[in-house]
Amino acid sequence: VLRIAWFALVLAPAGAWAAVPHLFFSDLESGPNTGGESNAGAYVTVYGKDFGSARGSSYVTIGGGQAAAYPVWTDTKVTFQLGAAAATGDLIVVVPDGSSNAIPFTVSRGRIFFVSPGGSDRKNGGFSSPWRTLVKARDSMRPGDITYAMNGVAQTADDGSGWNTSLLVRNGGHPAAPKAIVAYPNATATIGSVNGPATGIRTAPAEGGHPDHWVIAGFVLRGQGAAMGLWGSNGWRIVGNDISCPQGDGAAGCFDTVESSALKFYGNHVHDTGKENASSQYHAVYFGTDSNHLDIGWNTIANVHGCRGIQIHSSPQSGEAHSGQNQYDIRIHDNVIHDTQCDGIILATVDPSKGPVTVYNNVIYNAGKGPDNPERTGGWSCIYVPGYTNSGSAGSGAVEIFDNTFYGCGTFAKPPYSDQNAALAFGGGSPDLFLRIRNNIIFQTATSLFPAGVPYLAIWNPSTRHVCAAADDCRWIQGSNNLFYGSGPPPANPNITGSVNADPEFVNVSQHDFHLLGGSPARRRGVDTVSAVDQDGVPRGGAEGTDLGAFQFTGQ
């Protein structure tokens, strides 16, 4: 119920929407169409919009064949069982008013197992003879296998591996045959504990192998320090989990990675992370050392103690001479991030010249609200790009920031130092790195420190080591077609053109509904970007033009 409720909140409409459904992502990308419950194969969950509040005559096709069963059907989430008619090909949701976009799915080989509180690890793990523990499942699975955790499954104690974790993972699947542990439809299943082991799920490479290519989906994940910590683990897919670490502290994150790449982090609710006086080095979501090829989308990250909502930061590891390089090929999109002690997002060590670094279709509000952490350090913005380099060559090229909505950024009124409160900030660490901003809405608010409104920008000149004035020819930020409101006129920097300076007319700011009203000056003021749809899946451009911010106006 928790997971369905928060996802519906993220996607809640602000009026009537187009009736044709839109798919965002699925938990599984492959699975068998036989075996498991009723010999009808794997259960798959898709997330999106406009599926309808009840199934009625709607259905799902996989490679042209209809699914066998539908235990969950809501407007934003559908769970179905593949069935014998499913084939490799396009996965499509069909409703009376039309068909969704397609996402690929592969019908593959693999076994299906079940874990239940009433099961026994001496049984065979079938639907009618389930195992009792996820440890048994972990130790028994082969590449391509799927285990479903039934309602009430709780792997909360230390698993006895010696790694201070509830579930240690040291082996893996293959790119075309991952291992998957998924919550059974409508089940609440838990891994980790806020008062138990340090980590809920922990990975560590073993001699002769790496814990690569896993799917973890639909769980309640908890940890005293981290709900999930990936080390040397590639190709993971973390989908639709409820993640929280209210006792977290230290140099870590409630979800964190080291030397782990090609990750998909989709549709998770990360909330209430860090204890009240947590360290500045503690973050909600932390993609760490040499973690590249990251796709971070459709998550809600909220109520963060310590410091950042999302931290991208690479630092050398002891005994690894070439570790800690700048990070690249990073997509952060379609997220809602709010109520963070420091920045909503920090892209600390990035190099877009090696692979794009893009931030788009996000809603970020009340980020950088303070108070001080014990170290009295941090930054207070919606997005901060320091330009650090801890190992290797400095970053260069453009960090692309487009089609986002930012509200109330950097409101901490008692920072320990100046020029770090803003909506967007650049630290000047590399003279060859810059921000390109397009189609964003930046709505700032007043504080006791900034009675005329918190600054829109804080862009440090790498040469002078001072913040650029609003009218400076400051080349470390460029772009066009942004709306600035709440802190006076827009920046006069000649590298920022086509700005709008007016109230964007959101539907309901007090309820954090940042959809646009029909008369909004943000309508039809954008330029084309690579973002074909908005955060709701509504197409951008065309006859209606491109609106500014994370949401396209839908006609009502």
Residue ranges with predicted function:
Residues 497-556:
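C-terminal accessory segments
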Residues 18-29, 95, 103-136, 151-155, ...:
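Right-handed parallel beta-helix/beta-solenoid
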Residues 17-57, 88, 97-113:
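Beta-strand/beta-sandwich contexts
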Residues 69-71, 155-161, 166-226, 247, ...:
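Right-handed parallel beta-helix/beta-spiral solenoid domain characteristic of secreted/periplasmic
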Residues 178, 182-187, 209-223, 234-247, ...:
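Right-handed parallel beta-helix
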Residues 160-169, 193-207, 223-229, 247-258, ...:
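Extracellular beta-strand/beta-solenoid scaffold signature
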Residues 115-151, 156, 162-163, 520, ...:
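Acidic Gly/Asp/Thr-rich repetitive segments characteristic of extracellular carbohydrate-active
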Residues 157-165, 170, 334, 355-515:
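Predominantly extracellular beta-rich ligand-binding scaffolds that present long acidic/polar faces
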